[in-house]
Each structure stands twice: as C-alpha cells, then as structure tokens.
Amino acid sequence: MEGIQHPIPRTVEEVFSDFRGRRAGLIKALSTDVQKFYHQCDPEKENLCLYGLPNETWEVNLPVEEVPPELPEPALGINFARDGMQEKDWISLVAVHSDSWLISVAFYFGARFGFGKNERKRLFQMINDLPTIFEVVTGNAKQSKDQSANHNSSRSKSSGGKPRHSESHTKASKMSPPPRKEDESGDEDEDDEQGAVCGACGDNYGGDEFWICCDACEKWFHGKCVKITPAKAEHIKHYKCPSCTTSKKMKA
C-alpha cells in the first residue's frame, strides 16, 4: 500500500492539491479505466480497497496491515459486491464510498496540522466547488451554485435526447463544445457552456479544448481524457465512451 511515500501536505492549498490528485485518480478508475478496475475487483480475492493517489493514479489493493493506519482507509471489500449488483449500481456505490474517503483524508490532514475554523472552512469550500465523484460517474455533476439551478432546470426540461440531424451534422456537433440553447440570451449561453463538466475528469468546459460527446450516454468528454483527437473523431460515426463500451461488453 501507499503508506506515506508522497509528501505530507501541510497547508490548505497543499491539502486541496492532494485531494484533487486522489480524486482525479478515483474518477479515472471509475470512468475511463473502468474495465481494468472491474477485472481487478475479483470477488474471489480477499478484502480489496480502491485507493486514489496524489499523483492522479489509482490502485486496487489489500488494506494496510498497520493498526491504526497512517491515513484513513477506504471502504473494505468492494470486490465482494461486484457480481451481486448491476455494474452501474456497483460503480455508483464505490463512488459514494470514495467521496467519503476523500473527505476523511483531507480533514485528517487538517486535524493533524492544526487547521483552525477559517482554514477548515476554506478547505471545505474549495472541495465543495468540485463535483463529487458520484456526480461525475453518474452524469449528475453539479455546476457552481449560481449556475446550477438554471442549468439543471433547462436540461431536465429538454425533450430527452439530442435531436436527430443528418449524419454530417451529427458528426460535426459531436466534436463541438457542449451545445448552446438557441432561445437563450448570449450570457446564458456562455454560462451553460462554462457549466458543462467532463464525464471523465470532472473538470469544467474550457473554450480552447477539444470535446466529444458519447452517442450512448450523451455525456461530454475532453478528447484527451478519452484519447480521441479531432482527426480521429472525423472518422467515427457513432462514438461510445469507455464506460458505455465496457457496459456493452459486460452484458454480451
């Protein structure tokens, strides 16, 4: 297990950086690397845990033998429930436990290094500005407070799915940034676009980045997160993200 091989964060900024790194690794495990993660969680093995590491990687491993452990431990035995649930529900369950673990690690560091009321509040606000892992992997990522109400309302009132266009138009829109609503003002369009969240890493939309939309789950992804370039996307008629591709294979 990881022990304390990484630098120990001591300031609010360092603890938040540690949090973001671990979070990115966990999101990767439950989205772009989900097939690899699924196969590593063999129910025939002993109690396994999913660890997110500060360097944005992840690992499935046995819990540490040290008692009490140096850091709070993630949920034990996630592999035992794998075959007794729908894959989607199992991934969601692991995501919820992973969110809880991230918070416990962050505030463990806060307690260890004597964070006061204001420091704890600032740390929580920084963490709370990011979507939870559960929100990212289930496609329910929340935007910032001033955008969430209008943005989520407009999405829930949509007609349930993208309109069907010609194949050439579909291919073009697939590589475009998250779509704007034509009947909204320019400012609202900008807010809606900025509020879009990558289904893999959970980060918000950036105007200078290439994005692609999954035709199955209709989530948007950074091209770099799903290893798709603009040139490659030109030749894809119907794109499916790693999670949807894996789900289809599991059901086959």
From Swiss-Prot:
InterPro entries: Alfin (IPR045104), Alfin_N (IPR021998), PHD_AL_plant (IPR044104), Zinc_finger_PHD-type_CS (IPR019786), Znf_FYVE_PHD (IPR011011), Znf_PHD (IPR001965), Znf_PHD-finger (IPR019787), Znf_RING/FYVE/PHD (IPR013083). GO terms for cellular component: nucleus. Pfam families: Alfin (PF12165), PHD (PF00628). The keyword RNA-binding does not apply. Its main location: nucleus. Histone-binding component that specifically recognizes H3 tails trimethylated on 'Lys-4' (H3K4me3), which mark transcription start sites of virtually all active genes. This is PHD finger protein ALFIN-LIKE 7. The lineage of its organism: Eukaryota, Viridiplantae, Streptophyta, Embryophyta, Tracheophyta. The gene is AL7.
